[in-house]
């Protein structure tokens, strides 16, 4: 009787530079690193769990003042946001299927650092992989880091994967 595959949760997000459906530099690097260095050709020994956490805008709109919004506008916006998240996940699911590694993907909404840790507790992966933008001390104070929070609070081992130096934009906060 075979053993269960090792479950690797990878947190993914959209690029702050290119937006949906493009993955951020750091999460794409973390995902690719996981496939290259951990999974390699042992695809049947692993299952990739892809989690995308969408941050909900306070009023539900990025560019439109909600005072002019109807209930239907809010419903349409939620459906549009979900569709964008699905397109992002599709990129990663397709990569998993190309190499033959099993995967599951889902979307949650909320504060990424909290939701990732809640999902780790719920799903119980063997370990979590997150990308890291490599922010400096000053930027960390104002921007904060999801990866540092997950290292401290997730109930499983956490691997943080830095971006390659040649992939870092002029503003490291961009991703």
Curated annotation (Swiss-Prot):
Pfam families: Usp (PF00582). It comes from the Eukaryota. GO terms for molecular function: AMP binding. AMP binds at residues 11-13, 26-27, 53, 131, 133, 145-147. Coiled coil: none annotated. One of its GO terms (cellular component) is cytosol. Homohexamer. PANTHER family: ADENINE NUCLEOTIDE ALPHA HYDROLASES-LIKE SUPERFAMILY PROTEIN, UNIVERSAL STRESS PROTEIN A-LIKE PROTEIN. Belongs to the universal stress protein A family. This is Universal stress protein A-like protein. It comes from Arabidopsis thaliana (Mouse-ear cress). The lineage of its organism: Eukaryota, Viridiplantae, Streptophyta, Embryophyta, Tracheophyta.
């Amino acid at each position: 009787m075979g053993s269960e595959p090792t479950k690797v949760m990878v947190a993914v997000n959209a690029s702050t530079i290119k937006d949906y459906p493009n993955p951020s530099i750091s999460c794409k690097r973390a995902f690719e690193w996981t496939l290259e260095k951990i999974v390699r050709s042992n695809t049947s020994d692993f299952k990739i769990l892809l989690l995308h956490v969408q941050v909900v805008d306070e009023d539900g709109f990025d560019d439109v003042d909600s005072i002019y919004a109807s209930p239907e506008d809010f419903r349409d916006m939620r459906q549009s946001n979900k569709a964008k998240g699905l397109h992002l996940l599709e990129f990663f699911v397709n990569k998993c299927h190309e190499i033959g590694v099993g995967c599951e993907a889902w979307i949650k909404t909320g504060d990424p650092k909290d939701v990732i840790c809640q999902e780790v507790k719920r799903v119980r992966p063997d370990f979590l992989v997150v990308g890291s933008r490599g922010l400096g001390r000053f930027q960390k104070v104002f921007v904060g880091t999801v990866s540092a929070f997950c290292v401290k609070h997730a109930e499983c081992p956490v691997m943080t994967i830095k971006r390659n130096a040649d992939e870092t934009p002029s503003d490291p906060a961009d991703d």
